Amino acid sequence: MQNAAPQLPQRFNFAQDLLALNEARGNKIAFRDDHCDLSYAELDHRVRCFAAGLLAHGLQPEQRVLLVMIDTVDLPVAFLGALYAGVVPVPVNTLLTAENYGYMLTHSDAKMIVVSDALRSTVDPAVSACGHPLKIVVSGALANDRDIAFSSLLAQPPMPQPADTHADQFAFWLYSSGSTGQPKGTVHSHANLYWTAELYGKPVLALNEHDVVFSAAKLFFAYGLGNALTFPLSVGATVVLMSERPTPNAVFARLIKQKPTVFYGVPTLYVAMLAADALPDRDQLKLRLCVSAGEALPREVGERFSAHVGCDILDGLGSTEMLHIFLSNRSGAVRYGTSGTPVPGYEMALRDEHGQSVAVGDIGDLYIKGPSAALLYWNSRDKSTATFQGEWVKSGDKYTVDADGYYSYAGRSDDMLKVSGQYVSPIEVESALMAHDQVLECAVVGQTDVDGLTKTVAYVVLHESDAANDEMANILKAFVKNRLAPFKYPREIHFIRELPKTATGKIQRFKLREQDVG
């Protein structure tokens, strides 16, 4: 296994490692949000003050603190400050409900919640219903005299030395998607953060201190955390943070004004950007590289966007369990429509339902082995043992690999369709549909007909909604038939105005399947 990075000492604190790496960059901007800049010297000071503030409020090593925070400079301060103190930060999605936050507070047994003032009212029912003592820290304006001001923690004398943490010690949690039940508390170590930067951020993205990075994916996601904290701070780069939702116009404003050199997006955002009238010209930008993850990037979208902006999009596959991307395309060797090849330091295996390796070109379950794998799911033994199998992690994704070692996404394990006795990848059908110039977005699901057989059904968003009619449906069916095996074409095509999506922009196929049942 290729691994150019040094081995970590047993005693290791990732926050301290970042602060030490950037000690000589004190005057350089580390983070720039919508309202202020934060230099590396200020980051160092605030992180150590926040760490001291946590301890002053009685937080103990490995106790959890829930972070319900929008992307401002306070979020990296809170995250790194908790790591520095040996406390476990748990950044969570800011678009959830009070019920979701209530579950996470109880499940994590968090002793403190740090919340942005704009979200304070949303979490209030969860805080009120919390069955254990909980301290509430508010970033921004206080709404009452019971809450603790974020600024008061920063007023503490800085903690002189970090907590004596082990490289493999519980460092932080991320909650994985709960589309099939309650979200899982995915526990990661200090070492996991280090390895994602050493194996992907530095060698694959070639990040350096001269880069300015901007991630549309928020810091509470594994993808966003690496994009906008782990990787740039590991090389002394500057990060642009955006608190609002990543609409095309909001993204364009930052791309034009802040001139990032590296941009991280998701496929649905790239589609929306291409369709927007305000899409900037190449000479308005300073991009040298774009990255895509979250779901497979359609080949046509990758080719069109890269041609417009003049740089590659490196599509890849990552997961909350592996913390970031472990399969990736490379600059100068991009094959759009694939997830690329294994990131150095990671190994892949494709297996059938019996655990046997599949042949080149055949669909199999993807397993990953690498040093950034999560330690476990908190308080979920059955799910932990099903996912973390010795050195291997079962991804839940179906993939194929070609003779050149490029991996192509075939869908989630529960999305695969069996039509006429043969497996059909919905991603393959979607890619064929996306090649038609009238198709803006699409999603393919399986529907059971009156005979109990599965047929392929496509939901399509057109560039021009007026073109949605039976004739266009037949044109698209014929178009797919000419590109794929006959049994794979969609038997039904439904035209809709927009596809249901998660907060990260992933298409919610289960909602389309529910429509079918009706």
Language model segments and positions:
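ANL superfamily adenylate-forming
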Residues: M112, A118-A167, Q182, D277
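Gly/Ser/Thr-rich phosphate-binding loop
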Residues: A237, P260-G265, L274-R335, E347
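Conserved AMP-binding/adenylate-forming core of the ANL superfamily
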Residues: N27-T72, P76-L80, T97-G102, S151
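Conserved pre-ATP/AMP-binding loop-to-beta segment of ANL
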Residues: N27, Q156-Y175, Q182, A206-V212
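Conserved AMP-binding/adenylation subdomain of ANL enzymes
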Residues: Y194-V212, F220-T261, A276
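Conserved structural elements of the adenylate-forming
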Residues: D44-A52, A167, T186-N208, A216, ...
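AMP-binding/adenylate-forming catalytic core of the ANL superfamily
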Residues: L96, I113-V115, I256, F263, ...
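Conserved AMP-binding A3 loop
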Residues: S39-A41, A171-W195
